[in-house]
Amino acid sequence: MQQHFHFDAIVIGSGPGGEGAAMGLVKQGARVAVIERYNNVGGGCTHWGTIPSKALRHAVSRIIEFNQNPLYSDNARTIKSSFADILNHADRVINQQTRMRQGFYDRNHCHMFSGDASFIDANTVNVRYADGTSDTLQADNIVIATGSRPYRPVNVDFNHERIYDSDTILQLSHEPQHVIIYGAGVIGCEYASIFRGLSVKVDLINTRDRLLAFLDQEMSDALSYHFWNNGVVIRHNEEFEQIEGTTDGVIVHLKSGKKVKADCLLYANGRTGNTSGLGLENIGLEADSRGLLKVNSMYQTALSHVYAVGDVIGYPSLASAAYDQGRIAAQAMIKGEANVHLIEDIPTGIYTIPEISSVGKTEQELTAMKVPYEVGRAQFKHLARAQIVGMDTGSLKILFHRETKQILGIHCFGERAAEIIHIGQAIMEQKGEGNTLEYFVNTTFNYPTMAEAYRVAALNGLNRLF
């Protein structure tokens, strides 16, 4: 028998955006319902995206570290692990994350509904359960935090047993010797690192003229060189004409006339917002061609009581930003406005091997803006900590205004880059004279540390001034 429930707010989706919104609402005293279509909370971030891919990457990087460090191994003793082996590690992390996040909802008395959500009208949502039954929920405010999914062109047979997207690759059951990755964005590059780290041949097909073009060009070039040096074959400015599944693999026919064959293919070219099936037509909302919703600065859609956060609104499509967006939407919902907003310079972390992380402007952007900047660099190979741990590939680059010494951008390539970047970000976010390169010269760092790279880079940059 169908039941009817009323809440202060309904949150559709339990990924980072949904969690941020739900926690923000209950902490302000709201009675909240959370609808999650999957069996467990956490969304795509926990189950198919950020968490599993980073867990896989970590496992592979530790294998590489062991095999390359003469302290641990020699030619007669190396570690070899299969994709299935490292998937076990990812599964353990996923289970830990799921239990932890379920605890958040339980402790804060969120009302959980496991089913598919669709709008009946602007304040009413139907929840359809796996057994075919349904309930009706009503609320004064609703948050759409349904995330995104891999884009699947209609002319690619994703039912073929050797053709995967970034969700289904976690179900890889055979041990490939050769993988084609179509799409050289963040996901494609991260999986190229993972597979190559397992000694799998990798063909990385890039539809653009360089890798990760949004990065500072030096960082992009460093990744390209590192891939090349480790045997990844990169094919730039290529598009597929046909993707042909065979009995023992996949053949990609490129528009340039070339053909590439491998054991399997990972299609990682684009994502689509999860808005189909939500019944948006029943409330007068319409997603764009990529399934994304348009919102204002408080994450309100065209309907002021319906909010949207996370991947379903597009850029920046980061788990970190999605959580903050959810918190901001919750504050706006309860108080009528939000007194916090996303920071202007959101850091990016790309978990290739080695990592890449950036915050602020690139050299190319500053040159186009005609900003008089200077560069300070530190090579990891010159840091005692990097030498001790045997991870001396990489560098830190600080861009600063040559007159005011204000930090304008920070770019890091190397192990722990995504952690290292936040030291510089903290100074960049200071107002007025607090944002200065000289902070790194005038403070004392622990020694030996990777953080010391900031002092080295700052001194290097200041020595360039005249």
From Swiss-Prot:
The lineage of its organism: Bacteria, Pseudomonadati, Pseudomonadota, Gammaproteobacteria, Enterobacterales. InterPro entries: Class-I_Pyr_Nuc-Dis_Oxidored (IPR050151), FAD/NAD-bd_sf (IPR036188), FAD/NAD-binding_dom (IPR023753), FAD/NAD-linked_Rdtase_dimer_sf (IPR016156), Pyr_nuc-diS_OxRdtase (IPR001100), Pyr_nucl-diS_OxRdtase_dimer (IPR004099), STH_gammaproteobact (IPR022962). It is found in: Cytoplasm. Transmembrane segments: none annotated. Its cofactor is FAD. The keyword Oxidoreductase applies. One of its GO terms (biological process) is pyruvate metabolic process. Keywords: Cytoplasm, FAD, Flavoprotein, NAD, NADP, Oxidoreductase. Conversion of NADPH, generated by peripheral catabolic pathways, to NADH, which can enter the respiratory chain for energy generation. The keyword Ion transport does not apply. This is Soluble pyridine nucleotide transhydrogenase. One of its GO terms (cellular component) is cytosol. Binds 1 FAD per subunit. Belongs to the class-I pyridine nucleotide-disulfide oxidoreductase family. It catalyses: NAD(+) + NADPH = NADH + NADP(+). Its main location: cytoplasm. Its EC number is 1.6.1.1. GO terms for molecular function: dihydrolipoyl dehydrogenase (NADH) activity; flavin adenine dinucleotide binding; NAD(P)+ transhydrogenase (Si-specific) activity. FAD binds at residues 36-45. It comes from the Bacteria.
